[in-house]
C-alpha cells in the first residue's frame, strides 16, 4: 500500500508553490489603509461632513442679524389720485394709499407716478436675542461635528471587525483545503488498497463519504469568505470581489493584556449625546428670548414724482412727466417693537424644547448604562478569549499526535478506517479552533477599544 506520508509531502509542496504564487500576484491591503479608504470614501460619512458644512453656513446666517437691514424700492405707477379723510386697513399687508387733494368730485383720469425709497433699519438693542440664536447655531455645529466623529468611530470599528472576520474566514478556507487534501489522500490510498484486496470494500465507501464531507466544508468556508470580502469592501466605499488583506501580526502574536481597564466617558457616542443636550438647551434659550422686544434705529430717504403738478395741479398724462421727481424727503428715528401676545406661543415652544432637553438627557443616561455594561463584558470576554487562544495550541498538538498514531496503526492494519477518519475530524476541528480563538482574542481587544471609545488601544498593539 502506498504511504500516506509520501502523498502528503507531494500535496504540501504543490500547495506551498501555489500559495507563494498567489501571494506574489495579489497586492494586499493593510488595516490602516482600508481604514483611511473608508474614512475618505464611505458615502454616509460624506453626508455627515455635508451636514457640518450646512451648520457652518447657518451660523453665518445667524450672525447677519447683527447687521442693519437696507431696503431699496423703486416703482412706477399709473393711477388716479382721489382721496378722502379717514383711516383704512391694508389688504393683507399691501396698503393701497392714493395721495392727492380732497375734492368734491372724483377724477378718473389716470396719470403716471414714481417713487424711490431707501430704508435702513438697525436693531441696536435686542436683549440677547441675536446672541442666543448665534449660540444655538454654534451648538448645532458642535452637535454635527460630534455626530460625525461618532459615526466615523463606529464605522472604523465595523471595518476592523470585518477585517478580522475575513482573516478568520481565510484561515478556515486554508484549514478546510488541508482537510480536503487529507481526505483525497485517504480516498486514493484506500481505493488502491481495496482494489488490491488488502482492504474491505466498505473502506472505499467510507473514504468517499469523508471526501464529500470535506468538499462540503470547503465550499461553505469559501462562501463565507467571499461574502466577508464583499462586506469589507463595502465598508471601504468601493465594492470589490477579490480584495486581498494583509494578515499583519494577527496570527504571529496574541494581544497583550492591559494593567488597567480603560474608561468609557470619552466614548464618541456619549460625546454626541452630550452635544445633543447642549444644542437642545441652546435652542430653548433662543426660543425663550425670542419674546423680548427690539430697539431699532431707523433712517430713510425717498423721492416722488407725479403727472399732477405740485404747483398748479395741472394734469399731464405723458410718462416723462410722471417719472420726474418733484419732492424729496428724509427721516431719522428710533422705534421699539414688542409683540406682547406672542408670549403664549413662545411659552409653549420653550416647554417643548425643555422636554427635548430632558429626552436627550435620558438618552445619555441609557448610553452610559450600556457602555458601562459593554466595558465590563469586554473585560471578561478579553480574558477568556486570551485563555482559549493559549489552550488551542495544546489541543492542536494532541490532535496531530493522535492523527499520526491512527495513521500508523491504519497503515499497519491494526485499526479500521473509521477510527482514522475520527482522528482526521478531530485534527480538523483543532485547526479550525486555533484560527477562530486567535481571531476572537483580537476581536475581544477590539470590543474593549470600542467600549472605551479609543481605537488606538487596538491599533497600538499592531506596531
Predicted regions: what they are:
Residues 3, 151-266, 385, 427:
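Periplasmic alpha-helical coiled-coil/stalk elements that build and connect Gram-negative outer-membrane
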Residues 24-75, 81, 239-283, 339-340, ...:
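Bacterial Sec-pathway N-terminal export signals of envelope proteins
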Residues 27-162:
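Short flexible linkers and secondary-structure junctions
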Residues 46-50, 63-64, 108-110, 124-152, ...:
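Sec/SRP-type N-terminal targeting helices
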Residues 71, 80, 433-463:
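Acidic, low-complexity, intrinsically disordered peripheral segments
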Residues 73-119, 249-253, 298-338, 342, ...:
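Small/polar, glycine/serine/threonine/aspartate-rich low-complexity segments that form flexible
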Residues 194-198, 410-414, 451:
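A short glycine-centered flexible hinge/capping loop motif at secondary-structure junctions
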